[in-house]
């Protein structure tokens, strides 16, 4: 009888082989769900929520986030895979596949009586060797635009169809290069992703500036301004109550009138300072003047500004304030006490665009903007969500490539090279731990096998061809998914992120080892005592 039964008679328990079988079954189940997603030829999954909302995706991270997983072990693997996405932005599906395959290969040896601890030791040794191979084969290059296009294309083609991937590749690379500043880490929050529900996904484009999701609030304001000065501010231009609850007593109606005028004058003085600055910088010229305020602007102030030809936008989002100063130059001001020309930014074109009942303000033709906008277009919500998810992954892939300063060949080439190296390395290990190394080598080959299978080719036949070519040519050979034949991944421009593969090896080994070493599963929480 299990020891826990003596303490809690209602506890449920699975021991030794039963516990391992439960865990391996869960890992294999999750693997089977995500298996067909892998690679550019992967298939879509349709997720239907409880409310009947439909989501079409082949992104492993989205799937694992949205799926309701009840099995504790499957849930653990899903969390590890989504954590991989949070850290590196890719590799979710590969993570689940390799963990499932590691457990499957280990199960073959455990069923013959090998202790899980010995396999775990073999896994650890294999991981260290695999990381050495990764270091040897990584390709260090100067990250020029052409290389980054290849990296982005490899990532994006696994998320969306090829035609759309080609369009997104260009805009994603250009957006990261625009916000990249020498000596600073790349901040992807400076790439605003704005969606518009019209046209097609392939109409997605990069705006060298900013797009705000609201327009001016006064009918007489210009809808289009060229060569405009831009004042970015966080100052209230409407009457606000005092912070302290104060009351006033006035003896006559005249005194009340005076009080109202004094309150109004406080706001009018602020507005007048903006008008004076506009007259100073735009005197005798056709230059425009735009005010973008984070706080409110009341109708009287809007009227005064409109009369002087100033375009004013109120209640801009906080996240856009920093982006505005980076895109247009100038400084965001919190007070109008010492307004100068130096506070102003500049944009070549500011115009309002109306789509249905929604209004958008485009701030374009900025000089060397350090913040840009990706304008995502699509005919429906599904397309928009799919394109946005793909863009996020593409941005992360480029950021990783620039920060790593190196890449590794994709198309399953790196996994074939690691497996080959591990089979050779196995012979130098004494004892039964070499079986763990062999299991690890076999498990890594799941990636090229599934890539070939999803493209409609025979996995075994393709893998044998690739391995033979790898041994003969001594180059990193992957699977050409258009022909099913071996190809040199680097020559074809198929690149994966170095940090994704490194993280993959670490997380898969740790989780697979931990799951293997579980010999008892107990459900004995407080709820089971009821």
Curated annotation (Swiss-Prot):
Keywords: ATP-binding, Chaperone, Cytoplasm, Nucleotide-binding. It is found in: Cytoplasm. GO terms for biological process: protein folding. Testis-specific. GO terms for molecular function: ATP binding; ATP hydrolysis activity; ATP-dependent protein folding chaperone; protein folding chaperone; unfolded protein binding. One of its GO terms (cellular component) is chaperonin-containing T-complex. InterPro entries: Chap_CCT_zeta, Chaperone_TCP-1, Chaperonin_TCP-1_CS, Cpn60/GroEL/TCP-1, GroEL-like_apical_dom_sf, GROEL-like_equatorial_sf, TCP-1-like_intermed_sf, TCP-1_chaperonin. Belongs to the TCP-1 chaperonin family. PANTHER family: CHAPERONIN. Component of the chaperonin-containing T-complex (TRiC), a heterooligomeric complex of about 850 to 900 kDa that forms two stacked rings, 12 to 16 nm in diameter. Component of the chaperonin-containing T-complex (TRiC), a molecular chaperone complex that assists the folding of proteins upon ATP hydrolysis. This is T-complex protein 1 subunit zeta-2.
């Amino acid at each position: 009888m299990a020891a826990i039964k003596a303490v809690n008679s209602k506890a449920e328990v699975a021991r030794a082989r039963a516990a391992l079988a439960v865990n391996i079954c869960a890992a294999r189940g999750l693997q089977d769900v995500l298996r067909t997603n892998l690679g550019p030829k992967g298939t879509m999954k349709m997720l239907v929520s409880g409310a009947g909302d439909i989501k079409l995706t082949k992104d492993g991270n989205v799937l694992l986030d949205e799926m309701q997983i009840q099995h504790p072990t499957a849930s653990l693997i899903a969390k590890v895979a989504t954590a991989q996405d949070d850290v590196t932005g890719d590799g979710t599906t590969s993570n689940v596949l390799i963990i499932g395959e590691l457990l499957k290969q280990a199960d073959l040896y455990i069923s013959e009586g090998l202790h899980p601890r010995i396999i775990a030791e073999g896994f650890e040794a294999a991981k260290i060797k695999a990381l050495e191979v990764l270091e040897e084969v990584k390709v260090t290059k100067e990250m020029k635009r052409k290389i980054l296009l290849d990296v982005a294309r490899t990532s994006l083609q696994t998320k969306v169809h090829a035609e759309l991937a080609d369009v997104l590749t260009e805009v994603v690379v250009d957006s990261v290069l625009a916000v990249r500043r020498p000596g600073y880490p790349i901040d992807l929050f400076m790439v605003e992703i704005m969606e518009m529900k019209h046209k097609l996904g392939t109409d997605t484009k990069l705006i060298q500036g900013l797009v705000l999701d609201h327009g001016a609030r006064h009918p007489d304001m210009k809808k289009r301004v060229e060569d405009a000065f831009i004042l970015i501010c966080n100052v209230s231009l409407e009457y606000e109550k005092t912070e302290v609850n104060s009351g006033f007593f006035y003896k006559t109606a005249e005194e009340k009138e005076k009080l109202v005028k004094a309150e109004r004058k406080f706001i009018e003085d602020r507005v007048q300072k903006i008008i004076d600055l506009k007259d100073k910088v735009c005197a005798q010229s056709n230059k425009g003047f735009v005010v973008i305020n984070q706080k409110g602007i009341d109708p009287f102030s809007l009227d005064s500004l409109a009369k002087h030809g100033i375009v004013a936008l109120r209640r801009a989002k906080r996240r856009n304030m920093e982006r505005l100063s980076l895109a247009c130059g100038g400084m965001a001001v919190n007070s109008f006490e010492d307004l100068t020309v130096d506070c102003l930014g500049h944009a070549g074109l500011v115009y309002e665009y109306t789509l249905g009942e929604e209004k958008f303000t485009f701030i374009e033709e900025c000089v060397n903007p350090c913040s840009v906008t990706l304008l995502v277009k699509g005919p429906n919500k599904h397309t928009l969500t799919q394109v946005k998810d793909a863009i996020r992954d593409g941005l992360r892939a480029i950021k990783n490539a620039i920060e790593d300063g190196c890449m590794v060949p994709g198309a399953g080439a790196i996994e074939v090279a690691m497996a080959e190296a591990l089979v050779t390395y196995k012979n130098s290990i004494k004892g039964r731990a070499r079986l763990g190394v062999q299991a690890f080598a076999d498990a890594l080959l799941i990636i090229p096998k599934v890539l070939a299978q999803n493209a409609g080719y025979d996995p075994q036949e393709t893998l044998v061809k690739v391995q033979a070519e790898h041994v003969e040519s001594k180059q990193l050979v992957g699977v050409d998914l258009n022909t099913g034949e071996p190809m040199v991944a680097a020559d074809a421009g198929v690149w994966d992120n170095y940090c994704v593969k490194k993280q993959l090896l670490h997380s898969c080994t740790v989780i697979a080892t931990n799951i293997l070493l579980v010999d008892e599963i107990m459900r004995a929480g407080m709820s089971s005592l009821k």
